[in-house]
């Protein structure tokens, strides 16, 4: 499904819609790996007494702590100090990374759902009221919820780092901060993920609008392809200058890019009209988008299957 690839908010080169989820999947798989690595550090048993010194338990302290850990299926802390909070902060930092990806996904869908784009739409059930005064509104409510929740999770990251600044052997002040940060981050993450699942399951794509937007520039999105093909004959830098002139004229004068290319003897000496027309076909210049998307889908299914098995084992 061809779509305009955009960089810095402008048309760049053609891509496929499937390339976008491939990017999201790639990040998500790394998040899964990070949380797997975090688990044994995060879920630990702490029973070292009031100051973490085992003073009240004596020599049996480590064994008692280990026993409690066994019951809870947790590893015992090597140093059961109440001032240690890096593992808790790490959890929030990783939730922040996950939230950043989720927020990015929602923001992309939010943008592509704008009237001026119209390339995708989050699920909008029949009867949904977008506005009490504007009946035509089909607002991206779910994506807005995700973006807001993502911001809340990320905002908890500096709180968690601040909570690591504990004085002496314990301080309720930082404990309160950490508890607040963990609660906010975990609750908002759950809310965010639930809505993201709903969006992705019901996401509607509009290939006709994607193609219409792809053609908005009248072939300008294929300037790189023309430059590279021409560059094989006259040199890349010279080809860049030649195609640049045509592209800028198309912008400034509002003339068709194809016509400007066909009028330039620096181009027509090496490329005939059929060759130029072929080079301006955006569907022929999506690189390895399809392969990347298919590979990402395979890896996503494999990772999902692994997570399902791990859940059963737990």
Task: Cite the ranges covered by each PLM segment.
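Short, flexible active-site-proximal loops enriched in glycine and acidic residues
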Residues: 1-7, 76-77
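Internal glycine-rich alpha/beta core junctions
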Residues: 13-166
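Gly/Thr-rich phosphate-binding loop signature of adenosyl cofactor/nucleotide-binding cores
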Residues: 8-12
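Catalytic-core signal marking the mid-to-C-terminal active-site face
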Residues: 132-314
């Amino acid at each position: 499904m061809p779509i305009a690839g955009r960089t810095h908010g402008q048309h760049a080169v053609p891509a496929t819609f499937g390339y976008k989820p491939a990017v999201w999947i790639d990040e998500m798989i790394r998040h899964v790996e990070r949380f797997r690595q975090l688990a044994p550090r995060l879920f630990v048993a702490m029973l070292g007494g009031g100051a973490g010194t085992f003073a009240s338990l004596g020599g049996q302290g480590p064994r008692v702590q280990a026993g409690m850990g066994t019951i809870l299926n947790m590893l015992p802390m090597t140093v059961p100090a109440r001032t240690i909070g890096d593992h808790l902060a790490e959890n929030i930092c990783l939730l922040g990374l996950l939230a950043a990806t989720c927020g990015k996904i929602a923001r992309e869908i939010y943008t592509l759902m704008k009237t001026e784009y119209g390339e995708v739409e989050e699920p909008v059930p029949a009867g949904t009221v977008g506005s009490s005064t504007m009946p035509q509104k089909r607002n991206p409510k779910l994506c807005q919820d995700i973006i807001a929740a993502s911001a809340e999770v990320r905002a908890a990251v500096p709180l968690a780092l601040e909570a690591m600044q504990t004085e002496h052997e314990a301080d309720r002040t930082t404990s309160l901060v950490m508890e607040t940060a963990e609660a906010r981050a975990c609750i908002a993450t759950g809310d965010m993920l639930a809505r993201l699942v709903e969006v992705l399951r019901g996401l509607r794509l509009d290939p006709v609008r994607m193609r219409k937007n792809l053609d908005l520039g009248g072939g300008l999105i294929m300037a790189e392809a023309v430059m590279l093909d021409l560059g094989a004959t006259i040199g890349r830098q010279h080809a860049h200058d030649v195609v640049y002139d045509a592209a800028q004229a198309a912008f400034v004068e509002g003339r068709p890019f194809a016509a400007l290319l066909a009028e330039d003897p620096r181009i027509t000496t090496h490329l005939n009209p059929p060759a130029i027309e072929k080079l301006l076909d955006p569907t022929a210049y999506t690189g390895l988008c399809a392969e990347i998307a298919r590979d990402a889908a395979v890896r996503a299914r494999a990772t999902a299957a692994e997570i399902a098995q791990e859940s059963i084992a737990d």
